[in-house]
Curated annotation (Swiss-Prot):
Record carries keyword Disulfide bond: yes
Entry similarity comment: Belongs to the CRISP family.
Name assigned to this protein: Cysteine-rich venom protein asurin-1
Primary role: Blocks contraction of smooth muscle elicited by high potassium-induced depolarization, but does not block caffeine-stimulated contraction. May target voltage-gated calcium channels on smooth muscle.
Tissue: Expressed by the venom gland.
Species for this entry: Austrelaps superbus (Lowland copperhead snake)
């Protein structure tokens, strides 16, 4: 879906920016979409 593509684009860009940090982080985990967290955030916003 278009929403899923948009989320992936955001996550990919976010992770690319984090990888480009100088000096590099020693223990920086990649961000990924969490559907449950997204649903909770949407309920709060509604």
């Amino acid at each position: 879906s278009n929403k899923k593509d948009y989320r992936k684009e955001i996550v990919d860009k976010h992770n690319a920016l984090r990888r480009s940090v100088k000096p590099t982080a020693r223990n920086m985990l990649s961000m990924e979409v969490n559907s449950k967290a997204a649903q909770n955030a949407q309920r709060r916003x509604d």
